[in-house]
Structure formats: C-alpha cells, structure tokens
Regions:
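Short alpha-helical functional segments enriched in proximate histidine and acidic residues
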Residues: 154
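N-terminal leader/linker segments that precede catalytic domains of diphosphate-processing enzymes
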Residues: 1-125, 129-149, 157-237
Length: 237
C-alpha cells in the first residue's frame, strides 16, 4: 500500500525569525456565530478541549536560509473551525515546530494522539500549535521554545539530553507548515519507547496514548499526517 505524500514542499533552512504583531483576522469576525457553535459541538464530543490562545502565521518567506514571517494571536475555536472547514482563508498558516525523534539505532518514534485530543488516533511527532508561552518579551515567536516545551510535555524528555540536527526542515502541506528538527537519543528505539511509556503512565491526561516505532517505509500508517510521511520519505530516500 502506498502512503506517498504528493504536492508536499520540503526545504532545509537554518534559522527562524517570526514577529508577533496585531492583526485582524476577518474569517474569525465574519463567521463568529458559526465558529462558536462548531466549538461547542466539538467540546461536547471531547470535553477536554479548551478555548485557549494560539499563534498562527499570516505571512512568511524563506530567504538566505532564514524563515521570516509575521504571526498573530487568536483563540483556539477560530483555529479549529478554520482547520476543520478545510482552510477557508488560505492566507493563514498553522506553523509549528515538531521533534523528529530518532533513536540511536536509526528508527524514529511517533506518538498516537489520545482519545481526548482534537487529533485523536493520528500518529504524530511531538509537536503542538504555539501559544503565548512561546512569545518572547520582544514579541518574537520562539519556535525553539515551542519545540522544547511540547517535547517535554508529551514525552518527558529534555531537549538538552538529545543530539540536535544542524538544520530545520520546512514541510508544507496545504496550510500546515511543520518545522521539523531531528533530535537523536542515546537509547535504542525499544528502550526509548519504554522510557516514554513510563512517562505517559505517570500523567493524569497524557496527550499520547501509545508510542510507535518507525524503522522504514514498511512501517508507514494511514494515521500519519502527510507531513510526517513526507519528512520520513525524504530521510530514507
């Protein structure tokens, strides 16, 4: 079975410079009532969903090895409706950092999203849409902080204990902009999986319900988002 990810753009780059600036998102204003009803329905389905604040991108370019851009703050209900409805405003992007977690034996690990999450059942690298915790006092979106925070929250692993790849990988799938950083552990895939599962077992509401080992294309699964498959295909090309 083929799990190829067509029309996916992958670019290697070195640095991220994204400002956080005020911006009026017309989609969120024009469809306010529909958005509120949609979120209420989604929250009835998954009561753990919370309408917090998130950061989205409204402009970007990669130039001279640097990803430049402008981001804005909005609420999660706006983001969720925009995503669930197929990106009706194609000038906005869901940018996020993702940890391409690699074991010492060369296998990669992905997590199965827990039933309480909006992406239940999907197989993801540790990642998450940035929120105000990832904004510096100088109004810069720090996606390195976003990466470290999501990795720690979802796996219990400190980024400083892992060997970081030299560059970022930009993977665009429609309005999803995944910024992946390879992080290599000292443990084998099996030992790393066991360690993360112990962490998940200590959490009251873990974001992952299981950890899968991916040793090659034969382990691809339809529950993997296109950006995960595209990144791994590029690794094993």
């Amino acid at each position: 079975m083929s799990f190829g990810a067509p029309n996916i753009q992958i670019i290697e780059f070195d640095r991220i410079e994204i400002a956080v600036e005020p911006w009026r998102w017309e989609f969120s204003v024009a469809r306010r009532d529909e958005i509120d009803r949609h979120f209420a329905r989604r929250q009835r389905e998954r009561p753990a969903l919370w309408n917090g604040r998130v950061l989205l991108l409204n402009r970007y370019e990669i130039r001279g090895g640097v990803l430049h851009g402008s981001s804005f703050e909005t609420d999660y209900a706006n983001f969720l409706a925009w995503r669930d409805w197929g990106f009706p405003d194609a000038g906005v992007f869901n940018v996020f950092a993702a940890a391409a977690l690699r074991a010492a034996d060369g296998a990669y690990l992905v997590g199965e999203m827990a039933p309480t999450t909006a992406n239940a059942g999907q197989l993801h690298f540790p990642c998450g849409t940035p929120d105000p915790q990832d904004v510096t006092p100088g109004n810069v979106l720090d996606l390195g902080r976003n990466l470290s925070r999501e990795l720690l929250e979802e796996t219990g692993m400190e980024i400083g204990t892992l060997e970081s790849g030299p560059r970022w990988s930009f993977v665009r799938d429609r309005c999803f902009l995944a910024l992946l950083k390879r992080l290599t552990a000292r443990q084998s895939a099996e030992d790393l999986r066991s360690r993360i599962l112990r962490h998940l077992g200590s959490e009251a509401e873990p974001e992952f319900s299981d950890i899968r080992i991916v040793r090659g294309p034969a382990d691809f699964d339809p529950a993997m988002p296109p950006f995960v498959i595209a990144y791994l295909e590029n690794v094993w090309r």
